[in-house]
Regions:
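Charged, glycine-rich intrinsically disordered N-terminal tails and low-complexity linkers that flank
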Residues: 1-54, 59
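Nucleic-acid nuclease catalytic cores
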Residues: 42, 58-146
């Protein structure tokens, strides 16, 4: 995935953790971004995303979920911003962000980790809420509305 030329949702934790230099190097093309094509956790999360959306719809009995990813863009103070959300709950104009994590992780940890990304997406999409739908290992699913 091309990561140059804009600030995206995945960059929010890097910014919040203060690793500005590495982000700047990647965004300006001075350094390649990490190759995640052989990262099992990343690939598994991508592969199970549609299943996660379907489970969310089934559990919450929602039929108005746009299943395809939605991209939002903005130019803010001359800085291109872009966010690709996993899905949208149309009736609420809410974002759905799907994650797949290890079994012993907690929703509290996931909220802490992904809150910057979710807030960024909500701002870009001009949405007041975001569902975080998380599969923990292969035994548990939880969802919260932020």
């Amino acid at each position: 995935m091309e990561r140059k030329g804009f600030i995206g949702g995945s960059d929010m934790n890097v910014i919040m953790n203060g690793d500005w230099r590495k982000l700047w190097l990647v965004k300006t093309g001075r350094q390649e971004s990490d190759d995640l094509s052989n990262n099992l956790a990343v690939q598994l999360g991508s592969y199970t995303e549609q299943f996660n959306i379907n489970w969310f719809k089934k559990d919450l009995m929602l039929i108005d979920v746009l299943n395809e990813q939605q991209e939002f863009k903005m130019l803010w103070q001359g800085i291109p911003l872009k966010g690709t959300v996993d899905a949208i709950v149309k009736s609420e104009h809410a974002i759905l962000e799907c994650k797949h994590t290890y079994e012993s992780n907690t929703m509290e940890n996931c909220l802490r980790q992904y809150m910057p990304q979710m807030q960024f997406y909500m701002w870009l999409a001009q949405s007041s809420s975001c569902y975080l739908s998380v599969i923990f290992g292969n035994r548990k699913w939880e969802c919260v509305n932020v």
